[in-house]
């Protein structure tokens, strides 16, 4: 088989921000003026959750939070700030596990993660950032604004860093999507030996987030990456399709 290696390759470009993001910022305007590679039809724009949360006013001063008795009790038992625990519980659908100073919950979005996705990094002072209330809607709004201002049809993925239950280290995962399918299914297709694949489904949006994170990093003020040359069908999907149903959860 003759491969077209250009067609099989991805090109991932970081977008460096010179300014911090706040509710008065316009992410799309900054993206358009700051990127060095241009925006074209078929690009995948991966955006860090942190800047979306900041722009949507989801950065909260811990000092404004009044912890409940439950939060104070949990904080005492697990050596955490009771104000932070209160913020975690406010974003939580159910507590999955609390051990070794770690609180694993299912968020109201359905994500299972530490601290309900609440983060204290890359924000000033006593501030924390909560996840966007509706990351799919956030991604769709950004996608539409890019289309309006550039005329280009792109996919948008909002990413966040999650731990993994049976492996060390974190990876970036999609928490909101627009214009791209969340899963690429190979079910029913033959493998290289002609065997029919039955259960292979690739979480492509998560893999794209991990590729993007390699150039975005955590400390170089590049909260957006533009992925070029990824072949995909433009289609609206929902991040909920990546969440395993509870009846399929063997570990709950």
Describe the residue ranges of each PLM region:
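N-terminal and secondary-structure boundary signal
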Residues: 1-252
């Amino acid at each position: 088989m003759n491969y077209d290696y250009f067609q099989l390759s991805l090109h991932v470009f970081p977008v460096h921000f010179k300014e911090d993001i706040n509710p008065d910022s316009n992410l799309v305007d900054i993206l358009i003026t700051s990127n060095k590679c241009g925006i074209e039809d078929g690009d995948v724009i991966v955006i860090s959750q942190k800047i979306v949360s900041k722009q949507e006013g989801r950065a909260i001063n811990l000092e404004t939070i009044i912890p409940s008795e439950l939060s104070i009790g949990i904080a005492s038992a697990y050596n955490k700030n009771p104000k932070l625990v209160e913020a975690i519980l406010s974003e939580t659908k159910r507590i999955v596990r609390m051990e070794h100073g770690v609180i694993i919950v299912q968020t109201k979005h359905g994500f299972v993660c530490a601290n309900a996705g609440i983060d204290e990094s890359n924000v000033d002072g006593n501030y924390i950032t909560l996840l966007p209330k509706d990351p799919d809607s956030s991604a769709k709004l950004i996608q539409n604004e890019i289309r309006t201002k550039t005329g280009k049809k792109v996919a948008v993925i909002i990413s966040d860093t999650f731990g993994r239950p049976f492996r060390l280290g974190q990876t970036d995962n999609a928490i909101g999507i627009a214009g791209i399918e969340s899963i690429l299914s190979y079910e029913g297709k033959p493998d290289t030996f002609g065997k029919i694949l039955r259960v292979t489904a690739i979480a492509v949006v998560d893999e794209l987030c991990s590729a993007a994170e390699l150039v975005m990093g955590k400390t170089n003020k590049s909260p957006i990456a533009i992925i070029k040359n990824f072949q995909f069908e433009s289609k609206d999907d929902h991040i909920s399709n990546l969440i395993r149903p509870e009846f399929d959860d063997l570990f709950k």
